[in-house]
A protein has these predicted regions:
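Juxtamembrane inter-helical linkers in multi-pass membrane proteins
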Residues: 94, 248-256, 299-302, 424-427
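Perimembrane loop-to-helix junctions flanking transmembrane segments
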Residues: 43-47, 295-311, 598-601
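Membrane-interfacial, low-structure loops and terminal tails that flank and connect transmembrane helices
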Residues: 3, 247-265, 556-564, 734-736
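Soluble extramembrane regions of membrane proteins in the secretory/endomembrane system
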Residues: 26, 33-218
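Cytosolic-side transmembrane helix boundary signature
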Residues: 1-12
C-alpha cells in the first residue's frame, strides 16, 4: 500500500517551488496587459493641464526616494501611522466638489441627489481602458474644473505637510521644500485616487457615496468559505489518519558530539542576533511612542532630524528580518558539519562576515537614504528602495540572494553525503533556501531605479515578501524544528519527514499563490480577488496541522531529558502562539475580502504581524540559539528550565500587547472607516486640519497600554541576551 513513507518529499517540494514561480510569471502576462493606464496628460474641461504621465512616474519615484511609503500609505499599502495619501487626496478633491463627512451621515433624498452630483463632477474615465508593461503612458483624461481646483488644494496641503509641518507630524524637518517635487508627488497620489474612482481597485479605499466595495468583494468571500470547508474536510481526515499510522514507527536518538572550534564561531552570529532583537524591540516602542508624540521624544526636541518616524519604522522591521536571517545563517554553519558537510574556518568567517556586513549595509543605507544623505541615483542601489518592507537597497537584496544560494548549495551537498536519516531534511532546506534567494533577487529588480508603474512594483514586491514570510521561510523553520525532534528521539524519522515534507509543499503552494490577497486593492485585475481569497485562506491549513501536531507532542509526554522538554516547549509556543496569530488574525480572518476591505493597512495587520513574526519565526529561532549554546557547553539543564519559562513570558508579552492595545485600536479604526471612510483611520490630523485619530483621548490610552506587553517581552528577551553574551567568551575560540 502506498503511504507517506514511500513519498519522495524532496521531489514534491522542488516541484511546488518551481510551479509557484512558473504560475506567477505566467500570470504576470495577464496582469501586465490589464493595468490601469498612466495617461499622457490629465487636463480640465477648461483646457488646463494638471499633470502629465511623466509627472506621475516621477512622483512615484520621489515618494520612494523620500521614504514617504514608510510613513503613510498609498491605497493602504505602506505605514500604519501616517496618512493614507490616496484617501486624503481623494477627500481633499471631493471637498472642492461639495463632499463632506456630514453629508453621508444624513440619509435623505436631497443628500442622495447631492452625492450623485458630486459623483458626476469627480467621474474619471480612462481611454484606452488598460495599458501594458511595454507602454505605461497612454491616452488623455479630462476631468472637471472642480477636480482641477481640488488638485490645487491637495498640492497646497502636501506642500505644507512635507515642508513647514513635517517635523510636527513625525517626519524630518522640512523634508521636501521643492514645490515642483511636491506637485509631482501629488500627481502620483491623485492618479491612485483616479483609478479608485474609475473602478480599478474593486471599490477601495472606502469613501461613502463615492467609492464603495464591488459585488466581487462579497462573492469572493463566500467562495473562500466554501473552498476552505471542503479542503479542511478532505485534508484533515487523510493527514490525521496517516500521522496516526506513522506515530508507531520506531524512533532513534543521535548523541551529537561537542561542536568543534569552527562550529562554535557560529555562536558569534547568534549573539549579534539577540542584540539585534533587543534593539528592534526598543525601536518598536519608539515607533509606537511617535503615534501620540510625533514631534519629540518625551519632550526632547530635534529627534526627527536624526530618527524620524519613517526611518525608525524602516529600521524596526528590517531588524525583525535581519536577526532571524543572521541566526539561520549562523545555525546553518553550526549544523552543517553534523549533516556531513565540513566547514573551514575561512568559510565560516566569510559567510558570517558577508551576512553581518549586508545587515549593517541595509540599516545604514536606509537611515542615510531617508535622511537624504545619498545622492541620485545611488539611493536605490546602496540606500533604500523606499518600498514598504522591501526597502533594502537592490545591492543588498542581491547579496542576500547569493548568500541564500550558497547555503542552498551546502545543504544540497549534505543531502547527498550526509547521514541517511538527515538527507531528506537537508534536501528540503536546500530547496527552501534556493526559493528564498529567487524571491530576494526578484525584490532587487529592476536594480538601478524603481519600477515606473505602481501595479508592476506591487506585483513583484509582494512576491518577494511572500517568498520570505509565507512561502519558503516556513519550510526552513519547520524542517529544522522537526529534525531536532527526530535527532533527540521525540518523534519517528518517518513521521518527522512526513510533517516537514507535507508542510513544505503546502506552505510553498498556498503561501506563494496566496500572495494574491495583496492584489485586492492595488489596481490589479479582479481575478486576483478570487485567487487571493481562496489560496490565502488555505494558508491556514498547514499551520492548523502544526498546531494540532504541537498539542499531540505536548500531550503525548514521555520526555526524558531537559533538552527534549525544551524543544517541545518552544515548538508548542511557536505552533500554538504563532499559529493562532496567523490563522486567527491572518489567513483565517483579515484576508477574507469583505473583512480586509475595511481593515486593510490598519492595526489589524499589526496584530497579525506582532503575533506571527515573533512567535512563528522568533521562537523557533531562539530555540536554535539555545540548542547551539547547549551543545557547546554554554548552558546546562538549569538554564534550559529558565529558558522554558522565559519563552512563555515572551509569548505572553506579545499577546498582552495585541489584546490590550492593537486589537482595540483595530476595532476603533473599523468603527471610523465604516462611518466616515478610509481617510479617517490614519494621521494626527484630518485632510482639512481637524483632530485626527491619533489625537483622540481613547486612542492615546490604547497606544499607551502597549507599553505593558512591551516591557514583559523585553524582560524575557533579557533572559536570553545577558547569559548568551556572558557565556560567549568562554566557548568561542577566535584563534587557534
Amino acid at each position: 500500500m502506498y503511504s507517506f513513507k514511500n513519498i519522495e518529499w524532496g521531489r514534491l517540494v522542488l516541484i511546488a517551488a518551481i510551479l509557484v514561480y512558473v504560475v506567477y510569471f505566467g500570470m504576470a502576462y495577464y496582469t501586465f496587459t490589464h493595468m490601469p493606464p498612466i495617461p499622457d496628460e490629465v487636463v480640465t474641461k477648461g483646457g488646463r493641464i494638471l499633470f502629465t504621465g511623466d509627472d506621475i512616474i516621477q512622483g512615484k519615484i520621489l515618494a520612494q526616494k523620500y521614504g514617504l511609503l514608510d510613513y503613510g500609505s498609498v491605497l493602504g499599502f505602506g505605514g500604519y501611522f501616517g496618512i493614507d495619501y490616496t484617501s486624503y487626496t481623494l477627500a481633499i478633491i471631493a471637498k472642492e466638489a461639495g463632499w463632506s463627512p456630514t453629508l453621508i451621515q444624513l440619509k435623505n433624498a436631497s443628500n442622495n441627489d447631492e452625492i450623485n452630483r458630486i459623483r458626476e463632477i469627480l467621474a474619471v474615465s480612462f481611454d484606452p481602458q488598460y495599458t501594458t508593461l511595454l507602454e505605461y503612458t497612454k491616452g488623455r483624461v479630462v476631468v472637471s474644473d472642480d477636480f482641477g481646483r481640488g488638485f490645487d488644494a491637495a498640492v497646497n496641503y502636501f506642500t505644507r505637510f512635507f515642508g513647514s509641518k513635517a517635523e510636527s507630524v513625525g517626519l524630518k524637518p522640512n523634508l521636501i521644500t521643492d514645490n515642483e517635487s511636491v506637485r509631482k508627488i501629488v500627481a502620483f497620489f491623485t492618479w491612485t485616487a483616479m483609478i479608485a474612482l474609475a473602478g480599478y481597485t474593486n471599490g477601495f479605499p472606502y469613501m461613502p457615496g463615492l467609492v464603495e466595495p464591488h459585488l466581487d468583494v462579497v462573492q469572493a468571500t463566500w467562495v473562500t468559505f466554501l473552498i476552505f470547508i471542503i479542503a479542511v474536510m478532505i485534508a484533515a481526515g487523510y493527514i490525521m489518519i496517516k500521522f496516526i499510522d506513522l506515530w508507531r514507527e520506531p524512533r532513534i536518538r543521535v548523541d551529537l558530539p561537542p561542536p568543534d572550534d569552527v562550529q562554535r564561531l557560529a555562536l558569534l552570529g547568534m549573539a549579534l542576533a539577540v542584540l539585534g532583537l533587543s534593539i528592534q524591540g526598543l525601536l518598536g516602542g519608539y515607533v509606537m511612542h511617535k503615534y501620540t508624540d510625533p514631534e519629540t521624544l518625551y519632550g526632547i526636541k530635534g529627534i526627527n532630524s536624526i530618527l524620524p518616524y519613517n526611518v525608525a519604522r524602516g529600521l524596526h522591521y528590517n531588524l525583525a528580518v535581519l536577526w532571524l536571517v543572521i541566526s539561520w545563517v549562523s545555525f546553518s554553519l553550526f549544523a552543517l558539519p553534523y549533516l556531513g558537510v565540513r566547514i573551514s574556518r575561512r568559510q565560516a568567517f566569510l559567510v558570517l562576515g558577508a551576512g553581518v556586513l549586508t545587515a549593517v549595509g541595509i540599516l545604514l543605507g536606509l537611515w542615510a537614504s531617508y535622511l537624504r544623505l545619498i545622492p541620485d541615483p545611488y539611493w536605490f542601489i546602496i540606500g533604500s528602495q523606499g518600498r514598504p518592507v522591501i526597502s533594502q537597497g537592490s545591492l543588498y537584496l542581491i547579496l542576500i540572494a547569493v548568500l541564500a544560494w550558497y547555503l542552498s548549495y551546502l545543504f544540497y551537498k549534505a543531502s547527498r553525503i550526509g547521514p541517511e536519516v538527515t538527507r531528506p531534511f537537508s534536501k528540503i532546506l536546500s530547496i527552501a533556501l534556493a526559493g528564498t534567494g529567487v524571491g530576494a533577487f526578484i525584490g532587487s529588480l529592476p536594480i538601478t531605479a524603481p519600477w515606473p508603474h505602481f501595479v508592476v512594483d506591487e506585483y513583484f514586491r509582494w512576491i518577494t515578501i511572500h517568498a520570505f514570510v509565507e512561502g519558503f521561510w516556513p519550510p526552513i523553520v519547520v524542517t529544522i524544528m522537526v529534525l531536532l525532534l527526530v535527532l533527540t528521539g521525540v518523534v519517528p524519522p518517518a513521521l518527522g519527514l512526513a510533517v516537514a515534507g507535507l508542510d513544505a509543499v503546502l506552505e510553498i503552494a498556498t503561501g506563494m499563490i496566496g500572495t494574491a490577497h495583496h492584489y485586492y486593492w492595488g489596481g490589479q485585475p479582479t481575478m486576483w480577488l478570487y485567487v487571493g481569497a481562496v489560496f490565502s485562506t488555505l494558508e491556514a491549513l498547514p499551520l492548523g496541522f502544526l498546531i494540532a501536531y504541537s498539542l499531540i507532542l505536548w500531550r503525548r509526554g514521555g520526555l526524558t531529558n531537559e533538552l527534549q522538554k525544551t524543544i517541545v516547549t518552544f515548538i508548542t509556543v511557536a505552533g500554538i502562539g504563532g499559529g493562532v496569530g496567523v490563522i486567527g488574525f491572518g489567513a483565517g480572518l483579515i484576508n477574507m475580502p469583505i473583512i480586509n476591505y475595511y481593515i486593510h493597512g490598519t492595526q489589524g495587520t499589526m496584530v497579525h504581524a506582532h503575533l506571527a513574526m515573533p512567535l512563528s519565526y522568533g521562537v523557533p529561532t531562539m530555540l536554535m540559539w539555545i540548542v547551539a549554546f547547549y551543545l557547546s557547553g554554554g548552558f546546562g539543564d538549569s538554564w534550559l528550565r529558565r529558558f522554558r519559562y522565559a519563552i512563555v513570558v515572551f509569548a505572553a508579552g506579545f499577546y498582552i500587547q495585541a489584546f490590550l492595545s492593537l486589537m482595540p485600536l483595530m476595532i476603533k479604526q473599523f468603527s471610523l472607516v465604516t462611518s466616515f471612510g478610509y481617510w479617517s483611520i490614519k494621521g494626527i490630523e484630518t485632510p482639512w486640519g481637524g483632530i485626527g485619530i491619533w489625537e483622540m483621548p481613547d486612542v492615546k490610552t490604547f497606544v499607551g497600554l502597549r507599553f505593558i506587553g512591551d516591557v514583559i517581552a523585553a524582560i524575557a528577551i533579557a533572559v536570553f541576551l545577558i547569559p548568551m553574551w556572558l557565556k560567549l567568551p568562554k566557548i568561542v575560540i577566535l584563534k587557534r
